[in-house]
């Protein structure tokens, strides 16, 4: 029977990749560090119930993404009926648009883009996490990036 490693070892082994994901979504600074801390706090609470042999890194990255989204939403400005004359767009608007674009992709596209572009895994290693083959995963990522670019261009044309 396999058991999961001690949680301290999990933090040491996966802490860097979780911080990289948080920083990619929130930018460097205290928000990314808060998301990292909240990720491992939530993971510590849920760790005893995690199935033995589960993909711990993928599980942690999912938690980190949710925590980053929570922080972005908490920092999102409240809509007003009328904007003041000197209204300035918040610096995170682009990040929220990026998250919306990511959310519109298929689950496979989101995961492949995350593993390859955010965590730095080569396409040859990603089938170990997601199944499939490197060529199909590369295609899924390319299609996802193309869709995100298209959405970005449409948003620019509207503004």
What are the residue ranges of the model-derived segments?
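A short, charge-rich alpha-helical start-of-domain segment used by transcription regulators
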Residues: 1-20, 44, 110-111
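C-terminal flanking helix
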Residues: 15, 19, 40, 106, ...
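Arg/Lys-rich amphipathic alpha helix in sigma70-family domain 2
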Residues: 51-52, 61-82, 91
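DNA-recognition helix of helix-turn-helix
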Residues: 65, 69, 130-159
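Short alpha-helical "recognition helix" segments of helix-turn-helix
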Residues: 126-127
